[in-house]
UniProtKB/Swiss-Prot annotation:
Organism classification: Bacteria, Bacillati, Actinomycetota, Actinomycetes, Mycobacteriales
One of the GO BP terms on file: regulation of DNA-templated transcription
Molecular function terms from GO: uracil phosphoribosyltransferase activity
Record keywords, A-Z: Glycosyltransferase, Transcription, Transcription regulation, Transferase
Protein's recorded name: Bifunctional protein PyrR
Claim: Transcription regulation is one of the keywords in the record: yes
Top EC class for this record: transferase
Function: Regulates the transcription of the pyrimidine nucleotide (pyr) operon in response to exogenous pyrimidines.
Gene: pyrR
């Protein structure tokens, strides 16, 4: 019988995560024309749990780089998930939408990892119940591939092609006490 063990590799460290967030903030400024008059009102809505602190960080960087303060909030997708039958006991997360709502705005959904696309699909369904933005965009720190739905991020910090069996973990100082992105793979004796 072969012994299985997990190997954890740090792919992004503290400085890498910081640079990546700054780069995404610059891209949002450019694509949404935030620094020009007449641009849509832009808001960043984080998908709990990792997307919420990322949205706050992006908003701070956008303000630092452009002088424009964008609204932030959180959108709970729990009741919109398509796996509720498999995992029925999920804690509801708070939804907080900036005053004025989402109608006629550019909403940038923010999440830490894009994988199957199902979380984003649930967020799109939740948004539909809250109003009608002019545009919906997606910003993710990590895109690891393996989509099950036709969903693509507008802003990607790092593309990390992975095997389906590998796990990508995003650690954020607001939640985990430090910033890092790690890859965990299970290996057994004789694996190379």
């Amino acid at each position: 019988m072969s012994e299985r063990r997990n190997t954890v590799v740090e792919l992004l460290g503290e400085n890498d995560v910081s640079r990546t967030v700054a780069r995404i903030a610059h891209q949002i400024i450019e694509k949404t024309a935030l620094d020009s008059e007449g641009a849509d009102r832009v808001m960043l809505l984080g998908i709990p749990s990792g997307g919420v602190p990322l949205a706050e960080r992006l908003a701070a960087k956008i303000e630092e780089f452009s002088g424009v303060r964008v609204d932030t909030g959180a959108i709970d997708i729990t009741l919109y998930r398509d796996d509720l039958r498999n995992k029925p006991h999920r804690a509801l997360q708070p939804t907080s939408i900036p005053s004025g709502g989402i109608d006629k705005t550019t909403v940038v959904l923010v999440d830490d990892v894009l994988f199957s696309g199902r979380t984003v699909r649930a967020a799109l369904d939740a948004l539909r119940d809250l109003g009608r933005p002019n545009y919906i965009q997606l910003a993710v720190l990590v895109d690891r591939g393996h989509r099950q739905l036709p969903i693509r991020a507008d802003y990607v910090g790092k593309n990390l092609p992975t095997a389906r069996a590998e796990d990508v973990t995003v650690m954020l100082r607001e939640i985990d006490g430090r910033d890092a992105v790690t890859l965990t793979r299970e290996e057994g004796e004789g694996d190379n």
